[in-house]
A protein has these predicted regions:
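A sequence-level detector of short, solvent-exposed, charge-rich linear segments
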Residues: 40-43, 47, 70, 74, ...
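Generic detection of intrinsically disordered/low-complexity segments and helix-coil linkers/edges
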Residues: 4-5, 21, 77, 81, ...
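Generic structural signal for hydrophobic core residues of well-folded globular domains
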Residues: 54-58, 82-83, 118-122
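A recognition module on extended beta-rich or small alphabeta surfaces enriched in W/G with H and D/E
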Residues: 102-143
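Amphipathic protein-protein interaction modules
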Residues: 66-118
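Domain-length accessory/inserted modules outside core catalytic folds
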Residues: 13, 18, 28-30, 89, ...
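N-terminal low-complexity, intrinsically disordered segments
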Residues: 2-65
Length: 143
């Protein structure tokens, strides 16, 4: 047996997955409203500014993993709408997580933890830089 990448399987989002993602989006919308930010997320790059304001306000602590990952879902919605990716569930030896898939390829982006891991590790979160870096990575999918 070769030591390589863990085997990944892709699945369409099931109803339960859709409900969970919608709960996470609703949490972020409500948090933005409570912070007097425009809670109108549209999937465009302007959403990055709202997410950055939430992060900069330190509205969530490093221990609030689900809530921080909810920010990652909204970030993922920006990648999806701007780069033609679609949400899928990816299952491997480590578990089952939402990811963004490029067409029917194995090219994936995992936005769920892009914000949470940085905050949990005490690192700066620059959403514009994250967006630009991941966008460059996504551009390689079409080369």
């Amino acid at each position: 047996m070769s030591a390589g990448k863990p085997k990944q399987e892709f699945f369409a989002l099931e109803r339960e997955d859709l409900v969970h993602l919608e709960k996470q989006r609703a949490f972020v919308h409500e948090l933005a409203r409570r912070l007097d930010l425009s809670p109108s997320f549209s999937g465009n790059v302007g959403d990055l500014q709202i997410l950055q304001k939430i992060v900069d306000a330190s509205a969530l602590s490093a221990s609030q993993t689900w809530e921080l990952q909810s920010l990652g879902i909204v970030l993922g919605d920006v990648f999806a709408s701007q780069h033609g990716l679609r949400w899928v569930m990816v299952e491997d030896e480590y578990g089952r997580d939402p990811a963004l898939r490029f067409q029917n390829t194995s090219n994936l982006v995992f936005p769920l933890t892009m914000i949470s891991k940085r905050i949990e590790d005490g690192k700066e979160v620059d959403l514009q830089a994250i967006y630009e870096g991941v966008s460059a990575y996504i551009a390689e999918f079409t080369e």
